[in-house]
Regions:
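Gly/Thr-rich phosphate-binding beta-strand-loop-beta motif of the actin/hexokinase/Hsp70
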Residues: 2-26, 135-152
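Short glycine-rich phosphate-binding loop at a beta-alpha junction
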Residues: 68-79, 261-272, 293
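Conserved phosphate-binding catalytic cores of ATP/NTP-utilizing and phosphoryl-transfer enzymes
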Residues: 1-3, 107, 111-136, 310
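Short beta-strand-loop/turn "lid" adjacent to the catalytic site in phosphate-handling enzymes
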Residues: 60-99, 103
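Short glycine-rich, Thr/Ser-proximal phosphate-binding strand/loop in the N-terminal lobe
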Residues: 11-49, 157-163, 294
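Glycine-rich phosphate-binding loop plus the immediately following alpha-helix
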Residues: 116, 152-201, 228-232
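A contiguous, well-structured pocket-lining segment that forms one wall/lid of small-molecule binding clefts
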Residues: 191-266, 272-283, 287-290, 312-319
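Glycine-rich phosphate-binding/hydrolytic loop that grips phosphoryl groups
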Residues: 118-121, 295-320
Length: 320
């Protein structure tokens, strides 16, 4: 199928649309949801309201840049992950918009997941060669997910995503955001906490990294970081320790998953993975010689680029 493919993603953090063609990104538009200072996120009803308010403006930009008649298919994140009970009301805004556009244009609609979108976005560029592998590991590290996955490509697309493990309590992004809120940083706090960590003069604080097999626990590390801040520890040094803890945790998870599956490559995706500091620390802590890949930093945070590519590849694989 030649033409353009539209992707729509309405997550807990961002309203996103994207348009792709072959292997290139034609359009990538996003609006971050507004969270009051001091807040730890939005209620689903508030997020849904903001998506409905944001989508018309984003679609106006789409139609100003792209001839709708060139759109050959539409993809939408219909759920957070592929798990059977995975559901969040915020995705309804994207689903209804995608259904309306696909119906008006008489083009097929592909329902995918937010997680698959992240994985596919992280493959954009040089990592698309992973689709040629028999299997590879993936980590989806964000405010709502800290998942260890085994991905099986097939027929030029992501065929299956098998969960191997996860965080048993806090997600990595939650840990970052909670400490950021305590420090008075805007939500989501990732880029602000990373900037603060860059000011650390001493790097001796070591938060516990709790990993069992392919699952982890971050609540203990978060509690200790909170106590350190309450005790007067320098904020920048605690911020650095958070990223160091996450780096050690991710390396352990990848190593254990590699031992379990025999996969030799891991792709790290999700908003937390956009941190250049985290990437550097993971490289320093990777004493196992693991091949750890990342997507472009701009495509690690919530976006619809991966959703659009996933839809394109799904539809093209159906061609007779």
């Amino acid at each position: 199928m030649n033409g353009l493919y539209l992707g729509i993603d309405t997550s807990c953090y961002t309203t996103s649309i994207a348009c792709v063609e072959e292997k290139s990104i034609v359009l990538d538009e996003r609006t971050v949801l507004s969270v009051p200072l001091g807040g730890r996120g939005l209620r689903q009803s508030d997020g849904l309201f903001q998506h409905n308010r944001n989508l018309p403006a984003l679609l106006k930009r789409l139609y100003a840049s792209v001839n709708p008649k060139r759109i050959a298919g539409v993809g939408v994140s219909a759920a957070p992950t592929g798990a059977e009970q995975s559901y969040m009301p915020v995705f309804l805004a994207g689903i209804l918009t995608a259904e309306a556009i696909a119906g008006a244009l008489s083009v097929p609609l592909v329902r995918t997941t937010h997680q698959r979108g992240h994985l596919r976005a992280a493959m954009y560029g040089g990592n698309e060669t992973l689709l040629e592998k028999a299997r590879f590991l993936a980590l989806h590290v964000s405010g709502g997910t800290t998942d260890v996955l085994e991905v099986t490509p097939g027929n030029g697309l992501i065929e299956t995503v098998r969960p191997l493990g996860c965080s048993t309590d806090l997600h990595a992004g939650q840990m970052v955001d909670r400490l950021g809120v305590v420090l008075g940083l805007p939500f989501p706090a990732g880029k602000h906490l990373e900037m603060l960590a860059g000011d650390a003069e001493e790097k001796d604080i070591r938060l516990p990294s709790s990993v069992r097999g392919t699952s982890c626990s971050l609540s203990g590390a978060e509690s200790q970081a909170q106590r350190l801040l309450q005790g007067g520890a320098p904020a920048a040094e605690v911020a650095y320790a958070v990223y160091d803890c996450l780096a050690r945790t991710l390396v352990k998870l990848i190593h254990n998953a590699a031992q379990e599956t025999g996969c030799d490559t891991a792709l790290v995706s999700g908003g937390v993975a956009s941190s250049l500091l985290l990437r550097r620390l993971v490289g320093q802590r990777n004493r196992f010689g693991l091949e750890i890949r990342y997507g472009e930093s701009r495509l690690s945070s919530d976006n619809a680029v991966g959703v659009a590519f996933d839809a394109k590849e799904s539809l093209c694989s159906r061609k007779p």
